């Protein structure tokens, strides 16, 4: 499971899921909630993400934090 917080801008879910797809990670479940300018995502993956995926997600513009739980 990955949790992310990001600025609530159009296209952010697409950017996040593209990183996961490019790294051959399958999303089992995903929840996206927003409050004002901030969005919070909980993404359940089929397999544990490699560290490089967390780094790639963190490097995306408008991502505030990324955590594996």
Which residue ranges define each predicted feature?
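A conserved regulatory-domain signal marking ACT and ACT-like small-molecule sensing domains
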Residues: 1-69
């Amino acid at each position: 499971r990955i949790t992310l917080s990001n600025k609530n801008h159009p296209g952010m879910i697409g950017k996040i899921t593209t990183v996961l797809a490019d790294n051959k990670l399958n999303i089992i479940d995903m929840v996206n909630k927003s409050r004002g300018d901030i969005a919070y995502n909980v993404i359940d993956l089929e397999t544990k993400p490699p560290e490089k995926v967390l780094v790639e997600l963190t490097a995306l513009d408008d991502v505030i934090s990324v955590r594996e739980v």
